[in-house]
């Protein structure tokens, strides 16, 4: 199998697998006071220290979650619940991940004021529109660091500075960015930052929410775990694997980023030569090293995706969380693409274990299969 869908889930690193196996043998509950519980608590504390160190944060600022979707819910609902009277509004960019955007729509249906800020053709937010949108009623601004479909990097420090001037908090979804580019909550100016393990070689179902000291979040569910900020017994194997993977990803970031960027460049340039009219979504904007969102002219993206899959090549039509939807990508639509253009787009994403052979296989297969899916399926009927 040629795997080119690392933005959905990247394979677990050996260090993470080893950490998960070891943690599975720790049977105690971290909340218990006996010896087995203390052993579990020690593993939890050490894992928290490792994640905090990788983020340049303090352990007390890290809350473990089941992933970015839960983390976003804790952050958004918690921020609204703890906001001062009169601050009930949520502002977010038009290209946020569904875990943020869909929750905002649910809140809007319940009466919470929600404002969506447009982006330009590159996928970058309109800062003038954002400046107009954020006001004295705004409790929370949501701006992702790197878009999951296009890889475009958003100007989070500028957004954070604007939010701070208006007295609003900033939630930054750093899920795609962590382990690939520096994620320093202090430098970003964020108040809340999301990461999740499966994007940098950790296990699925384990994530972390960084909370700036002094930021109050109302509890979303009853339970004393994670200093009262996230209820439920902690997933120790997942947390241990998350910590191990993030530590390794950060330590090897420069080396892996350079290699991945070179592979992406080879993929993009090779396909541009072989496919006349190919377009790169997000061109002209800073991007992650491993994501290429490519628009194939006059193509049925789903048909091309299926053809690739039948040859053992795994790619994506966009966010894994919205695969199977008949609606065009909200990200590409926000960037000004027509429904047909959005449906002609495939996302190829590379990761820590991608190799040159993966790219060369795609360069051979994509143009050939594109010609096949464009060809008529039957001969014309006689007149």
Feature names for model-found ranges:
Residues 1-383:
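Pyridoxal 5′-phosphate
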């Amino acid at each position: 199998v040629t795997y080119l869908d690392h933005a959905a889930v990247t394979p677990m690193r050996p260090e993470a697998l080893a950490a998960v196996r070891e943690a599975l043998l720790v049977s105690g509950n971290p909340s218990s006071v006996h010896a087995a519980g203390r052993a579990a608590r020690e593993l939890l504390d050490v894992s928290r220290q490792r994640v905090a160190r990788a983020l340049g944060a303090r352990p007390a600022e890290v809350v473990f979650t089941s992933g970015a979707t839960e983390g976003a819910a804790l952050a958004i609902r918690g921020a609204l619940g703890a906001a001062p009277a009169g601050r009930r509004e949520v502002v977010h960019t038009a290209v946020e991940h569904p875990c943020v955007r869909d929750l905002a729509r649910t809140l809007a249906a319940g009466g919470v004021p929600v404002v969506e800020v447009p982006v330009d053709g590159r996928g970058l937010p309109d800062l003038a529109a954002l400046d107009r949108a954020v006001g004295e009623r705004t409790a929370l601004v949501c701006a992702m660091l790197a878009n999951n479909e296009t890889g475009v990097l958003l100007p989070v420090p500028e957004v954070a500075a604007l939010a701070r001037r208006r007295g609003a908090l900033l939630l930054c979804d750093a899920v795609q960015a962590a382990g690939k580019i520096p994620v320093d909550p202090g430098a970003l100016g964020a108040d809340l930052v999301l990461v999740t393990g499966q994007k940098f070689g950790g296990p699925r179902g384990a994530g972390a929410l960084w909370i700036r000291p002094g930021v109050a979040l109302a509890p979303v569910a009853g339970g004393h775990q994670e200093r009262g900020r996230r209820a439920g017994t902690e997933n120790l194997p997942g947390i241990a694997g998350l910590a191990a993977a993030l530590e390794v990803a950060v330590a090897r970031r420069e080396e892996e980023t350079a290699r991945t960027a070179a592979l992406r460049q080879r993929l993009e340039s090779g396909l541009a030569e072989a496919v006349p009219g190919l377009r790169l979504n997000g061109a002209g904007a800073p991007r992650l090293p491993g994501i290429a969102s490519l628009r194939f002219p006059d193509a049925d993206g789903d048909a091309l995706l299926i053809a690739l899959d039948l040859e053992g090549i795994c790619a994506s039509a966009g966010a894994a969380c919205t695969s199977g939807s008949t609606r065009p990508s909200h990200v590409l639509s926000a960037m000004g693409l027509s429904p047909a253009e959005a449906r002609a787009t495939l996302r190829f994403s590379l990761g820590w274990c991608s190799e040159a052979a993966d790219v060369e296989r795609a360069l051979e297969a994509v143009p050939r299969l594109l010609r096949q899916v464009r060809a008529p399926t039957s001969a014309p009927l006689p007149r």
